[in-house]
A protein has these predicted regions:
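Positively charged n-region of N-terminal signal peptides that target proteins for export
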Residues: 1-4
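Bacterial N-terminal signal peptides
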Residues: 7-18
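N-terminal hydrophobic targeting/anchoring segments and the immediately downstream early-domain regions
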Residues: 17-188, 237, 241-408
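Distinct, well-ordered alpha-helical segments
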Residues: 152-156, 217-227
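Short, contiguous, pocket-lining structural segments
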Residues: 186-193, 209-214, 246
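Alpha-helix-loop-beta-strand connector modules within alpha/beta enzyme cores
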Residues: 187-202, 221-229
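Substrate-binding cleft of carbohydrate-active enzyme catalytic domains
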Residues: 197-210, 214-217, 250-256
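His/Asp/Glu-rich metal/cofactor-coordinating catalytic motifs and the adjacent surface-exposed loops
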Residues: 223-233, 237-238, 244
Length: 408
């Protein structure tokens, strides 16, 4: 009997020890992930936060009950470099689009100045690193839609001088010189003028963003650009077969020329199940969206809130499936398996998309680092994905821009 008691005690002790080792190991990974995340430059290439600034009631410096981005949540999530999107609807063209874009740029710059204790305007990789060393959040700007140059190539120089560092060639609609992925083809990709736009962007140190564009526009831009392309907020078509996403061939040729695709967190682009279900209710959604536009007018934040409420109602009613934040990891992993860890990063579409369950805002970003670490990614590769890859492309762009300007 005594032997049995001793034996049971030994087993209990061994199991307790084993359990302790496992817990310690799990805690060690969590601790390593947190240390890695908060010591890295975490650079997201697309947030529509300026639309919230336009309301005049949103204070970037205070934690907000709505939306995805504000300074307190950026601090909590270790998000220390963010591209703010300058967005005007593609139905506004010419001088009005230019003026509205300039107003948004000015608004972003004002907010950075207003919150100078926490924020710093950045236009290149060196300035991002400097802000990080100072404990500040680097704010950058990208223009979402080539219609905002108003068919005037000189506006690229103006926007670049004001600190804009990328431009998406088209948005949901075709513009005057580039086809969109979600509109009927009008130009067979890029027009001659569109190709000149890409060359001028190279010259002015403005990254060429191929999110939203048609496949033909993408291949045209790839052929013309001397600087690696970026997809500021796109996901993998092999996982969710949406035209906004990139095919495996597109990812391969993008990577072959040094480019980077930044994964979008929008449910429609993350999950094929969700995309298919959404397509089945698209007619109802379109009718409701028209209703929202009538009620909200030009207030994109109002429209966005109404759309998110509608999607939550449809999910609650079982018409749309839930989408886990872990789909983001699936998309990242697909790109890494396809072309390696040097060509993928984070392009959330915060404040402009419906986030997946478990990653409701930017405060949840450390989950991504921990998940990648648990999958066996090296710390070096995780740092690349968090921001290092896009910093590399920015440095290449700056170098090529100087060479092109010197050759003029």
């Amino acid at each position: 009997m005594r032997r049995m008691v001793v034996f049971l005690c030994l087993i209990s002790c061994s199991c307790a020890g084993l359990f302790f080792v496992r817990c310690t190991s799990a805690d060690d990974i969590a601790d390593r992930a947190r240390q890695l995340h908060f010591s890295s430059i975490v650079l997201d290439t697309h947030a529509d936060t300026p639309q919230r600034l336009l309301t005049g009631t949103f204070d970037l410096g205070k934690r907000d009950a709505e939306g995805h981005v504000d300074i307190p949540r950026m601090r909590e999530g270790g998000l220390n470099a963010q591209f703010f999107s300058i967005f005007i609807t593609g139905k506004t063209l010419g001088p009005p689009a230019i003026q509205l874009a300039l107003d948004q740029i000015d608004l972003v710059r004002q907010n950075v100045q207003q919150h100078g204790k926490d924020l710093a305007l950045a236009t290149n990789a060196e300035e991002i690193r400097r802000a990080h060393a100072q404990g500040k959040i680097a704010i950058l700007m990208g223009i979402e839609g080539g219609h905002m140059i108003g068919n005037d190539i000189r506006m690229i120089r103006v926007y670049s001088a004001l600190g804009v560092r990328y431009m998406t060639l088209a948005h949901f609609y075709n513009d005057e010189w580039a086809d969109s992925s979600t509109d009927k083809p009008a130009h067979n990709g890029l027009t001659h003028f569109g190709k000149e736009v890409v060359r001028e962007m190279n010259r002015q140190d403005m990254l060429v963003d191929i999110s939203h564009v048609s496949d033909k526009t993408f291949y045209d831009a790839l052929e013309v650009s001397r600087v690696p392309l970026i997809a500021s907020h796109s996901s993998v078509r092999a996982i969710s077969n949406h035209p906004r996403n990139m095919s495996d061939d597109m990812i391969k040729v993008l990577a072959a020329k040094g480019g980077v695709m930044q994964i979008n967190y929008e449910r429609n682009y993350l999950s094929e199940e969700y995309r298919t279900a959404f397509a089945a209710v698209a007619g109802d959604v379109s009718r409701m969206e028209e209703k929202f536009k009538k009620e909200c007018g030009d207030d994109n934040v109002c429209i966005g809130k109404a759309e998110i409420r509608l999607e939550k109602e449809l999910t609650g009613a079982g018409k749309l499936p839930h989408v886990s934040w872990e789909k983001i990891i699936e998309h990242i992993d697909h790109v890494v398996r396809l072309v390696g860890p040097d060509h993928v990063g984070l392009g959330s579409d915060f404040d402009g998309a419906d986030m997946p369950d478990g990653l409701e805002d930017c405060s949840k970003l450390p989950k991504i680092t921990e998940a990648l670490l648990r999958k066996g990614y090296s710390e070096e590769d995780i740092r690349k994905i968090l921001g290092g890859n896009i910093l590399r492309v920015m440095e290449q762009s700056e170098k090529i821009s100087k060479e092109m300007q010197a050759a003029q």
